[in-house]
C-alpha cells in the first residue's frame, strides 16, 4: 500500500496553506482598522471564544 500520507496536505503546496492557515491573507487583513460596528461586534465575540 505504500506510505500513508495525511490527506489534508497537498504535496507541492505550502504545508501551512494546505491546513487552512492562509498566511498571506491573514497578514494582509490583520491590521485593518474596524468600523465602529465591527469593533462593537468584535468585543462581544471575544468573550465567547
From Swiss-Prot:
Q: Where is the region Disordered? A: 1-49
- What compartments host this protein? Spore core
NCBIfam families noted in UniProt: spore_sspO (TIGR02864)
Could you list this entry's UniProt keywords, alphabetically sorted.
Answer: Sporulation
Compositional bias per record (Polar residues), positions renumbered to this chain: 8-20
Q: Which residues form a coiled coil?
A: none
- Its protein name is Small, acid-soluble spore protein O
UniProt-listed InterPro entries: SASP_SspO
Extract one GO BP annotation from the record: asexual sporulation
Question: Its GO CC terms?
Answer: endospore-forming forespore
What is the organism field in this record?
Bacillus cereus (strain ATCC 14579 / DSM 31 / CCUG 7414 / JCM 2152 / NBRC 15305 / NCIMB 9373 / NCTC 2599 / NRRL B-3711)
**Where does it primarily localize?**
other
Expression is induced as follows: Expressed only in the forespore compartment of sporulating cells.
Which family is this protein grouped under? Belongs to the SspO family.
UniProt entry tagged with the keyword Lyase = no
Amino acid at each position: 500500500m505504500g506510505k500513508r500520507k495525511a490527506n489534508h496536505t497537498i504535496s507541492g503546496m505550502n504545508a501551512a496553506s494546505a491546513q487552512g492557515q492562509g498566511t498571506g491573507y491573514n497578514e494582509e487583513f490583520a491590521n485593518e482598522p474596524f468600523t465602529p460596528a465591527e469593533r462593537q461586534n468584535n468585543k462581544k465575540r471575544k468573550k465567547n471564544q
